[in-house]
Amino acid sequence: MEETNVKLSVPLSEDVIKLSALDQQIMRFYAKAVFIFERDSSKTSIDIVHHLKQGLAVTLSEIPDLAATIAPVPNSHRKDLELRIGPNSGVPFKVVDQTKQESWVYGTYPDLAAKHFPTSDIPHDILFIPQPQPSADGLPAAFLQVNIIDGGVIIAISWHHSVCDARGISILIDAWARHTATSLANGKPDLPATPAEGSRDRWRLDHGLREVTIDQLPEYTIDSSAREDPSGSYLLDRENPVTVPYSVSTWYFSASSLKALRDALAQVENDESTQFTKVEAVSALVWKHMSIARQLDRSNPDGSSLFTTRLDFRARTKPPFPDTFIGNINEPTARVRLPIAEICRASTPESLTTLAEAVRAATENTTEQSMRTLIGLVNDAPAVTDVAWKYNYFPGPDLGVTDISNIDAMKKNWGAGLGTPTCVRSYSRETGLLYLFPQDDDGGFEIQVQCEVEAVERLKADETFTRYCEFKRASAYNA
């Protein structure tokens, strides 16, 4: 077991990185992801760890934001945070040879693969560096644990959401993979690349509309207690774990089944030029069939369900942000509310098309103006964390989508000994979210949903749902 601090390959002097209004408002928690590799015999685990460190050091010189300390802004009365960087900045980096740990009872890489990688069943503090407690000095922007298992490697990444969104962390992952592969091939990584123009322009997300009222964003609320942590620290939001029994299930959409689903909906539209995207089609299918499986029409027949999905605004602004922008730029969510009776109507291509059209309209109507409205609300609030979401996710009827299917994490080659990841998963058990995971080489992707245990069984028996997606596994909690 080894724990160190991987510093920037080119140290920086003392500096402060100012966070944007969207960075300040976003959920304050550590997002977590795991990358699983099948290790071949061309490199030893010692070699792999050495070159992972080498590659990470160069990557952090390109993206120092994730090597920073996140801390309160001095004398701020609005609970603002900032990123502090300096010559000793780096990322806590822990290596655990799980083959030598009594606590590792989860088997070899082939064992995990046979069970379809049940990473959420592995206790957090075995797989990840334990989450630090907030202190006056702040918190690390990110920390990493490399787990060596028999036949494989599991990289567990935690990053503070205030630093960047999922696209931002994928930029770090892409660069880390590239520099590690070069280091493994040549014995040393390349020099740090110069960031693309606009990659660090967080200041552009401080300018919002004036005199915004909460009525303009009815699914949000102004509430100083909504996110307040009992400790009094505002470096992290209060945790609100689900206390009722639930299941997290994983399903797979192949490229052919995605095409079949989209084709079925296109026949209703009778216009192939307006064919729904994969995300629109899958969102409609899951929203309908999971609502039916949860029997929401029985428990709340006169109610409604809110659908939300996060959007990447990088290309939606004028001028657009580069794809390499580091920061949060995925709020507000696109939102649409429909009667539960409509959502739970018998599943046909026509009824699915109704939901897909609603999802499309919501995303098209969420524009840069929407983003500037939210920024204006944050700027005028007594504290940046007073702006909170007013969603009723699981066990309520609302459904949120986090779509990372267009992130190329499954296709990045990390070099000899590692290759490309065989599995990428979120470890977070966020309430009521549908995750769309990165596409594989064949164009398919996995999804992960949270619902009642009995609802999963109904989904497994749903012939229409399983026509398009294949059940992989499920884990029950709070049973």
UniProtKB/Swiss-Prot annotation:
The question of whether Ligase is a record keyword is answered with no
Q: What happens when the gene is disrupted?
A: Impairs the production of emerecellamide A, C, D, E and F.
List the EC numbers from the record. 2.3.1.-
A GO BP entry: emericellamide A biosynthetic process
The first-level EC class reads transferase
Provide the assembly information. Answer: Monomer.
Name of this protein: Acyltransferase easC
Source species, please?
A: Emericella nidulans (strain FGSC A4 / ATCC 38163 / CBS 112.46 / NRRL 194 / M139)
Q: Which gene encodes it?
A: easC
